[in-house]
Amino acid sequence: MAKRISMRFKHGKHVPGIIPIFVHDNLQYPSMKTITFIKQAGIILTACLGFQTVPAQNYEISNIVQSRAGDLKMMRPVGFKQFIEDFGAEGEVINVYPDVEYQEMLGFGGAITETSAYNFMKLSESRRNELAKAYFDATEGLGLNFCRVSIGSNDFALDDSPYVSNNDPKLTTFSIDRDRRYVIPMIKAAQRYCGELYLMATPWSPPAFMKDNGKTINGGKLLPEHRNTWADYIVRFLQEYKKEGINFFCMTVQNEPKASQKWQSCLYSGKEEGEYAVDFLKPHLDKAGFDTLKLIVWDHNKERVLERASESFAVPKARKAIWGVAFHWYSGKHFDQLRMTHERFPEKHLILSEFCKGPATGGTHVPYGDWSDAEDYCAEMIGDFNNYACASIDWNMIVDTKGGPCLYRDDIGGGKASVVADAENNSFELQSTYYAVGHFSKYVKRGARRIGNSTYDDNLLTSSFKNPDGSIAVIVLNKGNNNLRPLLRMNGKIMRLNLPRHSITTVSIKSKGAK
């Protein structure tokens, strides 16, 4: 219902030329208000304000951590002074608006590939516990809580064998024994340290006998006569994992459905993805009791997110059956693709489901541990979150010192990961990207809302979040060559930040008096 109010200046004078205005609830975005201005000339103007009319809270800085190029210690606590009254400073200011709320955050994590799990299990038990804690413990580690698991093999696996013997359409030989060796033990290790681990399931290819090219690799398409077989196969995967005490939060229809890769791959058009989700996957999942599993399309590069989402959601009943859209970072920034997709399909969830640096060796790629990788990760996450992504999932969580093991990649080599394990020496090293992710995951909790912020310099990238407990995390990337000392301004208060050149800073803010 609209409320009639008056607009006045600070000293009580009415705004010239404007008579009573009306404030309406914005039905699409509950945290926004629509204001109607009625001018004396009879012209009606409207504006959307993305804030709630709530009293301003008093906040205080609780912690600041920083990582920077050339520093041996990452996420180092740094000194700070508390907020003071805003004295009207202009220019070098970072603004944060706690009452301007956007999407809810679901989590951060990485892919528990067979490669990652194999490298994990090759370490001693004590080292495995140490590594699991470093990744998944919210107090002593990064607090990761959203991981991706392959349905079968992919290019970062030990072999290309499916869960069934060849030419078994009845799935009588179905077995996940290969996953019981490495993948499932790593998932269970993660679960021990993570409060609630969300898992995304993703297929790279159906078994060869289900495809028109007779191979798991080099693209090919799912044969029409095996559409039900493939859906049954996916259901069996979920059922077998459930027997192990592992449940999935969501799944994508297909990894990179536009790419005919030299490794495991399968091609779908946007329309075909939508049709398969609606006509086959969703009915099979519902019948088997997996009706709450969330279906996601695309799971490929950002430059085509809008078109592919539009094609899939044009399929009748697809907007009801499909929960979200996943994307990768390999084709450039394209952050506006996410914004436009959100604007067209505001109820859909956008997830950064894969990103990594690599190959690990050779060519023009930087070596392990290079700071530029951390900056690239941080810039990607800020850009995606500021355009409505609600989660980020890194690619391999662990590789060996050669970037593997891997399949079908002899010409380009392995990849990088945020942890490099050396089984021979029973050790592992945390890479710069580990800390880049940690600047978000350790301080932005599941259920947080992205909140409004703005900055003054193209070399300063920022993203801000309000946690369910009311605390706030502000992440700032200074990717420039100059040290900067901007003011952080929020709720009528300011404080000075010291941002070294090429650094990532997380500012933690709490309500005054909160523990």
Model regions: which residues?
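Bacterial Sec-dependent N-terminal signal peptides
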Residues: 1-58
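A general structural signal for short secondary-structure junctions and capping/turn motifs
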Residues: 34, 55-57, 99-102, 136-141, ...
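Short, surface-exposed recognition loops or helix-turn segments adjacent to catalytic cores
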Residues: 51, 251-253
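Substrate-binding and catalytic surfaces of secreted/luminal carbohydrate-active proteins
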Residues: 59-70, 88-92, 200-201, 232-239, ...
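Residues that line or immediately flank small-molecule/substrate-binding pockets and catalytic motifs
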Residues: 112, 151, 255, 328-329, ...
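Ser/Thr-centric signal marking residues that sit
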Residues: 113, 252, 505
